[in-house]
Amino acid sequence: MSSIHSTAIVDPGAELDSSVTVGPYAVIGPKVRIGAGTSVGPHCVIEGRTTIGRDNRIFQFASLGAIPQDKKYAGEDTCLEIGDRNTIREFCTFNLGVPGAGGVTRVGDDNWIMAYCHIAHDCLVGNHTTLSNNTTLAGHVELGDWVTVGGLVGIHQFVKIGAHAMVGFASAVSQDVPPFMLVDGNPMGVRGFNIVGLKRRGFSADRLAAVKQMHRLLYRQGLTLEAAAKAIEELAAEHPEAAGDITLLRDFIVSSTRGIAR
C-alpha cells in the first residue's frame, strides 16, 4: 500500500504503485500514474494526464501537469510524461502539451532539475540533463542528452539545444545551440566547446580532437553553414571513434529551423 499522508488528497482514479510516498497536503488528480519508488513532497500538485516513472524525487510545491500557458488551449486531452530517476526540486512547473504539436510534454530519465525551473508545453527534455535554478523553457524547446543549463536562463520557443552542450548563467537563448558547444551571454555567443563536460563523460582523445576540429570548422574558418556541414562530415575518415559525434553535429546543423548560434 502506498504511504500517503492523511492530509494529502489523492483522487480514487489515480494509479500509484504501492511503494510511492505522498507528503502532507499534496494533491494528485484522477488521470495521474506514478511508478515504483517515487516520492512526492509536501504541497505538490500533480494533475492532468500525467505519467511519472519510477524512483523520482519530487520536492515540495512542485506543480506538474497543469494546463499549458497557451491562449489557444481549450481543454483538449494532452499529457505530460516524466521518466525515471529524476530529481525535481521546489516550485518547478511542468505543463501539459497542446494539440496540433504532438500534445506531449516529455522529460526523460536521470535529469537534475533545480528549484523554480519551468518546462512549458510540448518541450522534449532528454536524459542526464542539468537545469539550474530558474531555468525557463518556452514551448516546444528540445534539449538533448547531457545538456547543462546555468541559472536564470531563458530559452525561446522552438529552440533546440544539442547533446552535451552547455549554456552559461543568465543567458538568453534565441537560436539553436549545436551539440558539444558552450554558449553564454545576452546577446548569446559561442565561447568554445564544452571540453570540461566531455572529459567528465569519458570522451576519448580522438573524440575530443574531433569536437575541437568541428568547432573550428563551424566558428573559426569563415565557412557558410552548408560548407561547414560538408567539411564536418568529411572528418569521419580521420576520426573513426567520433563517427557518431560527427553525424550528430552534422545532422543538427542541416535540420535547424531557427538558425545556429554563431
Curated annotation (Swiss-Prot):
Keyword DNA-binding: no
Reactions this protein catalyses: a (3R)-hydroxyacyl-[ACP] + UDP-N-acetyl-alpha-D-glucosamine = a UDP-3-O-[(3R)-3-hydroxyacyl]-N-acetyl-alpha-D-glucosamine + holo-[ACP]
Entry protein name: Acyl-[acyl-carrier-protein]--UDP-N-acetylglucosamine O-acyltransferase
EC number assigned by the record: 2.3.1.129
Any one Gene Ontology molecular-function term assigned to this protein's record: acyl-[acyl-carrier-protein]-UDP-N-acetylglucosamine O-acyltransferase activity
One BP term from GO: lipid A biosynthetic process
NCBIfam families according to UniProt: lipid_A_lpxA (TIGR01852), PRK05289.1 (NF003657)
Signal peptide: none
Organism: Paracidovorax citrulli (strain AAC00-1) (Acidovorax citrulli)
